[in-house]
Amino acid sequence: DLREMEILDRQSRVPFRAGTYRPDYLVSEKGDLLLCEITSRFFGHGIFMSYFADCAAERFLRKIGTEDGRGIDFPLYSTLNERLQYVLQITGDKKEIYVLKSADKTGEIALYKPFYEAWGKRVEIFEAEDVERNIDRWKKGFVISALNQKDLLSFSDGTTEAMIEAGMYNDFRTIFLIHDKRFMNLWFQDAFTDRCLTGEEAAFLRSHAIPTYLYGDRDDIWQEARRNKDGFILKHHRLGKSEKVYAGPLTDKRTWEKMWENGDVQNMVLQPFIRQRKYPTVWEGTLFEDYICGMMLCADDRYFDSGMFRASSLPVTNVGDDRKVCPIHTDDPRIMQRADI
């Protein structure tokens, strides 16, 4: 996209700050953890929402520690305070925070708005249609993006330049490049990884990532996918929240074939469909056999450990039932035997 490249060219004049991003991974039938995508369109994705997982984990440990009058104090390993301190620190001494948002549904704003306000910051939200006429109001504050790519690309050069100069979180490179699922294809290209990783690091990354193919790349694999839908999954390269994601085993033959006929596949990436491990879980007394999608919470060059996991009876979460899981890091058998997973 020419417009996108123009914005990225101007952004390249500024040192890269990744902002917040959330790599997601699946668990294969063999137990391998495999990265499937990175969510980084919106600031704070997972950073704040995982607070609820910390609370649930704390309650769980307190409950089993007080059973039978044992009074055991099971420690909770959590990076909650560390990650909240970091997202407060990056605002610096700016007292005003401006959130620029699209119509996309997100629960994060409802969490980080009161968080920053509790620390004496004033938080104001501008809908996408109000962003351009309020440049003079937001450009001197700490600017947070909750804008999707379509809205960002609709803004004038003056508006995107103001976002760059304001040091908007997230950086356009994070929004347009890291969030784009085509980025994962580069992890398997020596010409790319040789510039930033050692051979050992590249091999490790590839062993924990799902191979990702671009349209027009490896025609043999794309043709195999067209014939054998159950072995593959198609994903729109830009969208999130499982929008325009077609898992072969869950997609009827006509819908699958139609994506080739009308050219939709040209805007998609292709991945092998990973057969995932199922976990027996109990939710409000009902037994489920769930797939698990894990997440990694990251900000700039820092990794803040696991956030809130998602569980679903379908191999693609967000397209059907969607439940939440709180991770607890422990090697204590007294805790492990009480956990669902």
Predicted regions and their residues:
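Short, solvent-exposed loop/edge-beta patches enriched in aromatic
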Residues: 16, 27-33
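Residue-level marker for buried hydrophobic side chains located in beta-strands
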Residues: 21, 32-34, 232
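Structured beta-strand/loop patches that form or line metal/cofactor-binding pockets in enzymes
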Residues: 9-19, 277-283
